[in-house]
Amino acid sequence: MKLTVDDVRSRFVEHFDGTTGSVYSSPGRINLIGEHTDYNGGFVFPGAVTQGVIAEIKPNGTRKVRAYSIDLKDYVEFSLDDEKGPSATHFRFIFGVCREMMKLGVPVEGFNTAFAGDVPLGAGMSSSAALESTYAFALNDLFADNKIDKFTLAKVGQATEHNYIGCNCGIMDQFASVFGKAGSLMRLDCRSLEFKYFPFDPKGYKLVLLNSQVKHELASSAYNDRRKSCENVVAAMKRHWPNVDSLRDATYDMLDEVRPEVSEEDALRAKYVIGEKYRVLEVCVALEEGDYEEVGKKMYETHYGLSKEYEVSCPELDFLNDVAHSCGVTGSRIMGGGFGGCTINLVSDDLYANFIETAKKAYKEKFGKEPIVIDVVIGDGSRKLC
């Protein structure tokens, strides 16, 4: 069931003084294409979704924040002047946002708050960014008269991850959550942080995630290996072309020229990243022309590259991609870092029911459990609901 304002408001009234506050929301996100491109200075292509976090907030006239997690049935009090903050991660997000906003000179005061979310956990849809963005947006409204620009609010969320959670993330998740726009995806340039909206209104198609329910343990070490491969190829190119700073600057011809200087594994991984740069730009053109068949074709190409060139897939994800292809699904690929998580699928309305039924049955026969089906609609970014 869809999370509503009433769900949060009833718990807020119940846990605090019986009066109501202001209600804010921020979404999770998907990334249509542009995977493992962020740390290579390339493009990503996210969109906000209709699943997100809803929080009710009311200043309480003290220096204390009193927070209640509806989903976890957990409560905490912390002082805004405390250097350490609460230990529970879900409350550290709120604490971190408060501290980062205070660093910007926002006169944050104590408040009561209750919050809940319906972003599926473990699906790579950035529930944490939704939580951070909700509170950054709310504190800007309540204590700064909305003087902090959206770009800075996204960076507040990123800084919270870095400084209070210990996750050295990029900016995409928070950016998509704050800047999301219904009916549009964003092409975000990870080098300049410039972005542009592109129409995404696929009439006759649905966007659906299939969560494999697996996460293979080698993900973090494999991520570092691949990042090093990219750096190795850039170093080789830089000897020939000093202006090359990342694979964003590279072409296939340049890669061919330095192949004798790098390992075959490194070259193959660089080939994927270079190709993904072009695929994102090709998807931009396809969306402007309303050509969703071409979008789907590029999604399949990305999956092939992630599986066979960048080698971040796993049997479960390749199986789901194969099922999608055999069912005539328009487009399908790994979404996220790989080694588990979800596939993102663009499927025509007339094939949707058969695809879901076939995928669930075949996956259960092969792996002993069904994938979790998550229907996705592109929605708006951070906002005040009431």
Q: Which role does the model predict for each range below?
A:
Residues 113-115, 210-212, 343:
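A structural signal for short, well-ordered beta-strand segments
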Residues 130, 342-346:
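FabD-like malonyl-/acyl-CoA
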Residues 1-29, 54-87, 184-331, 346-386:
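C-terminal nucleotide
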Residues 46-48, 56-59, 105:
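Short, charge-rich binding segments
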Residues 41-48, 226-227:
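Short Gly/aromatic-enriched secondary-structure transition segments
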Residues 339:
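Glycine-rich phosphate-binding loop
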Residues 1-24, 30, 34, 39, ...:
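Gly/Ser-rich oxyanion-binding loop with an adjacent helix/lid
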